[in-house]
């Protein structure tokens, strides 16, 4: 089984982990109801996508 020859320093460990962070999701505004929604997805509040009513959208009453 392979074993590390040298101890990995804190600096090298942290440099390796520099790209492991999470990015916040980008949000766009729904043109119908002006609520925030994720791009390229149907609006969760009004159920429209590209100006059309999406079948099977859960309406909040």
Curated annotation (Swiss-Prot):
Molecular function GO terms recorded: structural constituent of ribosome
A single GO BP: translation
Basic residues biased stretches: 1-16
Highest taxon, organism lineage: Bacteria
Annotated region described as Disordered, given as residue ranges: 1-20
Keyword Ribonucleoprotein attributed: yes
InterPro entries: Ribosomal_bL32 (IPR002677), Ribosomal_bL32_bact (IPR044957), Ribosomal_zn-bd (IPR011332)
One cellular-component annotation, GO: large ribosomal subunit
Keyword line: Ribonucleoprotein, Ribosomal protein
Keyword Ribonucleoprotein listed: yes
Similarity field: Belongs to the bacterial ribosomal protein bL32 family.
PANTHER family noted in UniProt: 50S RIBOSOMAL PROTEIN L32 (PTHR35534), LARGE RIBOSOMAL SUBUNIT PROTEIN BL32 (PTHR35534:SF1)
Identification of the protein by name: Large ribosomal subunit protein bL32
Organism: Trichlorobacter lovleyi (strain ATCC BAA-1151 / DSM 17278 / SZ)
Lineage start: Bacteria, Pseudomonadati, Thermodesulfobacteriota, Desulfuromonadia, Geobacterales
Gene name as annotated: rpmF
